[in-house]
Amino acid sequence: MKIAMIGAGGWGTAMMIELAGRNNDLIMYCRNPARADEMRKTRENGEYLPGAHIPEKIRITSDLEEAVEGAGCVIICTPSHVVEEMAARLKPWLMKDAVVVCASKGLADNEGHRLSEGITKEVAGITDKIVALSGPNHAEEVGIGLPCATVAASAVPEAVQIVQDLYMSPVFRVYRSDDIRGVEYG
């Protein structure tokens, strides 16, 4: 399966590194072309996750269409204030019934709107497989393979199972839930 990570900060980079040991087509979108070039050359995200090696298996692009088109799973890992905008931007290339994972942390605004609500609104009619991924994790720990645990939550059990299957490993534990509100507010 093609997996697109939308966001190349510390958390997005760490989450992609975690997937590198599995048999998937991995691509990470970085909005800054110069930074994407630097990451391709050095195989490191020196700005946000120094010291963590980015395996060659992970393609890095600054072209959103290239990242999203054909992806069965799209993981949005941007600052919370741009999650909904990013969901709207990727919509033209989003595959029907793709799993869209929100790995960003926080709320959409000061009124308490959840990030998954904005994603759901933007991709309505294309997919209902929206998953919130959250846990007591730090990018610098995940990026170097330290043990961690997270929760994947969705109203669609199949979507949660896909995310659990993608990430579950001896050092990265993924627990399923249907309480997306609780996971996002927790």
Q: Language-model features: where?
A:
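NAD(P)+-binding Rossmann beta1-loop-alpha1 motif at the extreme N-terminus of oxidoreductases
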Residues: 1-50, 59-62, 89
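Glycine-rich beta-alpha junction loops
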Residues: 32, 107, 134-138, 154-156, ...
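Rossmann-like NAD(P)(H) cofactor-binding subdomain of soluble oxidoreductases
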Residues: 54, 61-69, 73-147, 163-164
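Short, conserved active-site loop motifs that form the nucleotide-linked donor/cofactor pocket
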Residues: 57-59, 172
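Conserved Rossmann-fold dehydrogenase catalytic segment
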Residues: 136-143, 170-186
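Conserved anion/nucleotide-ligand pocket segment
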Residues: 147-174
